[in-house]
From Swiss-Prot:
Oligomeric form and interacting partners: Heptamer of 7 subunits arranged in a ring. Interacts with the chaperonin GroEL.
Cell compartments where the protein resides: Cytoplasm
Span of the signal peptide: none
Protein name: Co-chaperonin GroES
HAMAP family assigned to the protein according to its UniProt record, in alphabetical order: CH10
Gene assigned in the entry: groES
Length: 102
């Protein structure tokens, strides 16, 4: 398991990852402020910790994502967790749809 300079003390198991969702847009292109109640849940976040991978046929399968990656994930995937005042998402690696290269 790797963590982003120990930012989070959550150690994911098997093929799970810990993601910190990125903030959704606060305003529209025309400058209108979007209230919290109307915002879509973010589907983009930074990977903070990665589990060791799951076992298949006695071998551990490595994950495609690594700490620091910015990923797109399934809208309803994962479990929201609040730890030390911060909100995180614990996802199965299967819920990651893509890695965003910036």
């Amino acid at each position: 398991m790797t963590t982003a300079s120990s930012k989070v003390a959550i150690k994911p198991l098997e093929d799970r990852i810990v993601v910190q969702p990125l903030d959704a847009e606060q305003t529209t292109a025309s400058g209108l402020v979007i209230p919290d109640t109307a915002k879509e849940k973010p589907q983009e976040g930074v990977v903070l910790a990665v589990g060791p991978g799951r076992f298949e046929n006695g071998e551990r399968l490595p994950l495609d994502v690594k700490t620091g990656d910015v990923v797109l994930y399934s809208k309803y995937g994962g479990t929201e967790v609040k730890y030390n005042g911060e909100e995180y998402l614990v996802l199965s690696a299967r819920d990651v749809l893509a890695i965003i290269e910036k």
